[in-house]
A protein has these predicted regions:
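N-terminal "domain-start" segment that seeds a small globular fold
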Residues: 13-39, 152-164
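Hydrophobic beta-strand anchors of alpha/beta hydrolase catalytic cores
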Residues: 48-49, 79, 123
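Structural microenvironment flanking redox-active thiols in thiol-disulfide oxidoreductases
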Residues: 60-97, 107-113
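Thiol-/selenol-based redox modules, centered on thioredoxin-like
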Residues: 125-165
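Short loop/turn microsegments at loop-to-beta-strand junctions
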Residues: 24-25, 46, 120-121
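Bacterial Sec-dependent N-terminal signal peptides
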Residues: 1-19
Length: 165
């Protein structure tokens, strides 16, 4: 009986993990002023989730590239950086990006667990219909390739081509 109960517990936790091409799960997140937001606010546009941490160098590079991407494509895509840091660390972080930076005030435990966060950066692309198109962990090249296939962008294309050489 114990084995069966453990199996059910593991099976239910697997069921909670995001699956490609399945509908996204909505989460409540907060901006730095404490205003409540939901990812579904942007349904109808491509949504890029970037799970980030203050001490993560690849995250800083990704934020810089995504800031330009967002400014060129904000009519069809939203970018949301979700902090995996604790609330105090995140509140003290200073950034200069034009896209949304949100936190769940809990080190991204729930939303991070759903998307399989165990290392930053983690990238998620959500289709305008709300289905998950892409999840990648710490691979800038693979993420930008998939992003460019869904939301073509000349600058992202240049970055991808420069890495091919």
């Amino acid at each position: 009986m114990f084995f069966f109960a453990c199996f059910l517990a593991v099976q239910s936790s697997w069921a909670q993990q995001a699956q490609l091409y399945s509908p996204m799960k909505d989460f409540t997140l907060y901006d730095r002023k404490g205003n409540e937001h939901k990812v579904s606010e942007f349904k109808g546009k491509y949504i890029v989730l970037l799970f980030t941490s203050q001490d993560c160098e690849p995250c800083k590079e990704a934020k810089s590239i995504l800031d330009g991407f967002y400014n060129r494509n904000k009519d069809k895509a939203e970018v949301i950086a979700i902090s995996a840091d604790d609330k105090d660390t995140w509140q003290k972080e200073t950034t200069n990006v034009s896209f949304n930076e949100w936190s769940d005030n809990n080190s991204a435990k729930d939303i991070g667990s759903y998307y399989g966060l165990n290392l930053c950066p983690l990238f998620v692309i959500i289709h305008p219909n709300g289905n998950i198109l892409h999840i990648s962990k710490a691979r800038l090249g693979g993420f930008f390739k998939d992003l460019n296939e869904n939301v073509p962008d000349a600058e992202i294309e240049k970055i991808l081509n420069s890495h091919k050489k």
